């Protein structure tokens, strides 16, 4: 029975995924982007009037009434997993592998199955838009569709700006943004489906999902970290030595994973091998600033390892309670991680040393500053992503998901307004935006973060300080 989010699925579809990875590298020379077919297709996918390529593919396959019910259940199950996954590179990679698996299971003779990715086919941006940005699979009330479409327009506008490096001068945030500043700031937030913490279930996920995945006795799937490390170490500078906090033994452990087999992916010659397959990442680029990178390794850990969400929560509490004095957060992080026995609550040495290998600034950004990191930490469910399901309950969950009963919202946190503002904020960091527009976005984001009880450093500081 098909279960998403498995390392074995990624390795099994290596040949197809290599095409996707090759099409997710930036051109070697930026001036070549204008006529580059990959960049042209990505730009076209981000046009508000362009159809979703994944939706088009799926509808072309299910027109036939003989489409097996198992396809709908497998696809809905993948969508359910994506609903509880962080928006990052690893999630896009896992979704791509699972889509390959579903196609090979149910349409083995279709030509599209063996040419799923690459120019003229699906690209990383198409997977991001379908599964994580627009979430085309979500069941939505008819009266909400137009409002959500307006928010999706804003998201695609700023994602396109991150690709081109600038937001159109005609864009005006005040006239494009739905007014929320006069709404009541107390009580349940009207812009999303958050439940009160006193009435929400203990685990936060739906009851059927808890019965399917939760329980200390449930075995966990293998980590996806080896694939993440392998691919990024061979195609980018993100994991280049020396990582400031990786001592020699730690680096050798990371390299032992990478060197234990042939590289999963070897980038083509005519490509930028400093930024990796960044076109599968939300920011569509790898940029550095003040000891941080736009590709957050800690967000990748959330999607790649079952221990990561709890470990990072524990680390955050440890940093806050480490010293009673008014010591800066960056210093607190450095002091906590300076202990050679730091993070004993993480059993996997690879995860522990990857986190400890991050700079204090990277950890500060993820735990206390960046809205996208905070959103990822809020929506992720390690039980859904990494617990092996109970067979009978899993059959019920698949049927329910295929009927759309579990795809209306992420019950941990689901707010289109906040998600849209977070994308706009990332656009401020990675594209040229007018000063007035930038101030208006930060003002609205700050208010929404406060209303949703997301306690972070002020976004204006983060936008100037970190990548």
Curated annotation (Swiss-Prot):
<feature type="binding site">
    <location>
        <position position="366"/>
    </location>
    <ligand>
        <name>Zn(2+) 2</name>
    </ligand>
</feature>
<comment type="similarity">
    <text>Belongs to the herpesviridae UL32 protein family.</text>
</comment>
<feature type="binding site">
    <location>
        <position position="452"/>
    </location>
    <ligand>
        <name>Zn(2+) 3</name>
    </ligand>
</feature>
<dbReference type="Pfam" id="PF01673">
    <property type="entry name" value="Herpes_env"/>
</dbReference>
<comment type="subunit">
    <text>Forms a homopentameric ring.</text>
</comment>
<keyword id="KW-1048">Host nucleus</keyword>
<feature type="binding site">
    <location>
        <position position="136"/>
    </location>
    <ligand>
        <name>Zn(2+) 1</name>
    </ligand>
</feature>
<feature type="region of interest" description="Zinc finger 2">
    <location>
        <begin position="296"/>
        <end position="373"/>
    </location>
</feature>
<comment type="function">
    <text>Plays a role in efficient localization of neo-synthesized capsids to nuclear replication compartments, thereby controlling cleavage and packaging of virus genomic DNA. Facilitates thereby the transfer of newly replicated viral genomes to the packaging motor.</text>
</comment>
<feature type="binding site">
    <location>
        <position position="55"/>
    </location>
    <ligand>
        <name>Zn(2+) 1</name>
    </ligand>
</feature>
<keyword id="KW-0863">Zinc-finger</keyword>
<feature type="binding site">
    <location>
        <position position="130"/>
    </location>
    <ligand>
        <name>Zn(2+) 1</name>
    </ligand>
</feature>
<feature type="binding site">
    <location>
        <position position="191"/>
    </location>
    <ligand>
        <name>Zn(2+) 3</name>
    </ligand>
</feature>
<feature type="region of interest" description="Zinc finger 3">
    <location>
        <begin position="191"/>
        <end position="452"/>
    </location>
</feature>
<feature type="binding site">
    <location>
        <position position="296"/>
    </location>
    <ligand>
        <name>Zn(2+) 2</name>
    </ligand>
</feature>
<dbReference type="GO" id="GO:0042025">
    <property type="term" value="C:host cell nucleus"/>
</dbReference>
<dbReference type="GO" id="GO:0008270">
    <property type="term" value="F:zinc ion binding"/>
</dbReference>
<feature type="binding site">
    <location>
        <position position="415"/>
    </location>
    <ligand>
        <name>Zn(2+) 3</name>
    </ligand>
</feature>
<feature type="binding site">
    <location>
        <position position="373"/>
    </location>
    <ligand>
        <name>Zn(2+) 2</name>
    </ligand>
</feature>
<dbReference type="GO" id="GO:0019031">
    <property type="term" value="C:viral envelope"/>
</dbReference>
<protein>
    <recommendedName>
        <fullName>Packaging protein UL32 homolog</fullName>
    </recommendedName>
</protein>
<keyword id="KW-0479">Metal-binding</keyword>
<feature type="binding site">
    <location>
        <position position="52"/>
    </location>
    <ligand>
        <name>Zn(2+) 1</name>
    </ligand>
</feature>
<dbReference type="InterPro" id="IPR002597">
    <property type="entry name" value="Herpes_env"/>
</dbReference>
<feature type="region of interest" description="Zinc finger 1">
    <location>
        <begin position="52"/>
        <end position="136"/>
    </location>
</feature>
<dbReference type="GO" id="GO:0030430">
    <property type="term" value="C:host cell cytoplasm"/>
</dbReference>
<keyword id="KW-0862">Zinc</keyword>
<keyword id="KW-1035">Host cytoplasm</keyword>
<feature type="binding site">
    <location>
        <position position="192"/>
    </location>
    <ligand>
        <name>Zn(2+) 3</name>
    </ligand>
</feature>
<feature type="binding site">
    <location>
        <position position="299"/>
    </location>
    <ligand>
        <name>Zn(2+) 2</name>
    </ligand>
</feature>
